[in-house]
């Protein structure tokens, strides 16, 4: 899929995700929160490869945890894949940025320059710092859960954060405490 161009500045909201948040949410059965919150999400082909899904709508390249649910989201049409070659590559300022984060940030910058309102879903510290340094708005998995609770899409954050941790998804004690305090679950 080629990168679409917005017709008027500020009229298109594009949500672009890195692999980590998608995998984490898929592994705890909450991937559909992204559809409920944003309607649709875009990933780059590099991120799709990291996850283990193919460009074909219902093909799961392997059996990595969460890959099947993410492939189903692609087949349902609310998760789209953009070829990484469809946008100019941006050299990261931070050497810790991986290829998925790099292409996610490149795509977000491309669409932002074309006038779209973008939001980047990323959890990795280096990826978040890189996106922030380039003026991109970001949100992480923990904040997504806060928004989902505020919009009454989930009854509580604590069990989902615990499930993420049980699946090996890193959430610092400080982050968990801050989120639970924010949603009155401390």
PLM segments and residue spans:
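Active-site-proximal, substrate-binding regions of enzyme catalytic domains
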Residues: 2-119, 125, 134-136, 174, ...
